[in-house]
Amino acid sequence: MKELVVVAIGGNSIIKDNASQSIEHQAEAVKAVADTVLEMLASDYDIVLTHGNGPQVGLDLRRAEIAHKREGLPLTPLANCVADTQGGIGYLIQQALNNRLARHGEKKAVTVVTQVEVDKNDPGFAHPTKPIGAFFSDSQRDELQKANPDWCFVEDAGRGYRRVVASPEPKRIVEAPAIKALIQQGFVVIGAGGGGIPVVRTDAGDYQSVDAVIDKDLSTALLAREIHADILVITTGVEKVCIHFGKPQQQALDRVDIATMTRYMQEGHFPPGSMLPKIIASLTFLEQGGKEVIITTPECLPAALRGETGTHIIKT
C-alpha cells in the first residue's frame, strides 16, 4: 500500500513579495510546485496538497473594500474571500498538475472547496493574530489605521506591517470523507486551502460561515489526522528548522523526536506567527497517530522525502 503524504504549501511560496502579486506571477510559481509533486508521484506516494492564502486573501479583501467605498459595490465577507482564494489558487495548482500528469501518468488532480468547523466561542475571535495581505510601511499603516480604526496590524518578520484578523483553532474538516474517497479513486487532491472556510454550527445544526482565517498548518495537520496520512510535510522558507535562529550559535535540526522538539518549543526557539504554528501542528499530528513530519523548502521536498535533507520530526 502506498504511503499517504499531506503537503502544506505556503501562500508566500506563490506570492513571494509585493512585486509578484499578479495572477501571471502566481501561475509561474505554481508550476514549480507542480514539478515537485510530479517528482513525488514518481516515488509512488498518494498525495494531498493544502496551501496558504495569506497574501491572496488580504488582496481580495482589500479589493472588495476599495470597490465598496469608491463604487458602492457590495462588500465581500472575509469567509467568502477565503472561499474565492481556495477556488482561485486551487485552480492554478490543479491546472498545472493536470497539464503535467496528462503527459506523464494516469492520475488526475482535483480541488475540493473545504469548510472547517471552528468553535464560535474560540478566544481567537477576540484577539486577531493572523497576518494577511500586503506589507505596509509605517506611513501606509498609519494612513490605513486612521481610515479603519477597527483594523489591527502587526510588524511581520522585519518586512513591514500587515493587517491581522481572527484565527480560531480548527476542530473538524467537513469535507474530509470526500477527500479520502477521492484519494482512494487515485486523485491528487488539493483541499483545505487557506486553512479552510471557517464555519460554525448553528443551534439548528446548520453550518454558517464566520469571518476569520484559520492557520493553514493547523488545518493541514487536522486533515492529515482525519484522513489517516502517514507523513505530514510543511514547506517553509528554510531548508531546516533551526534553534538559536539568527544567532552565532544557530543550529539546524536534522532528526528530532517529539520530546526534544517540545523542549525546544518551551524554551522559546520558535517565534509565534512563523515557525511556532508549524511546530505545534507537527507535534499534534504525531501525538495523534502520524508517523513522521518533514519541514523544509518546496525545492528540497523530494530530497527530504528520500531522507537527504530537511528537518524530520519523529515519535521517538
Curated annotation (Swiss-Prot):
GO terms for cellular component: cytosol. SUPFAM superfamilies: Carbamate kinase-like (SSF53633). Keywords: Kinase, Transferase. The keyword Kinase applies. GO terms for molecular function: carbamate kinase activity. Pfam families: AA_kinase (PF00696). The keyword Lipid biosynthesis does not apply. InterPro entries: AceGlu_kinase-like_sf, Asp/Glu/Uridylate_kinase, Carb_kinase. One of its GO terms (biological process) is arginine deiminase pathway. Belongs to the carbamate kinase family. This is Carbamate kinase-like protein YahI. It comes from Escherichia coli (strain K12).
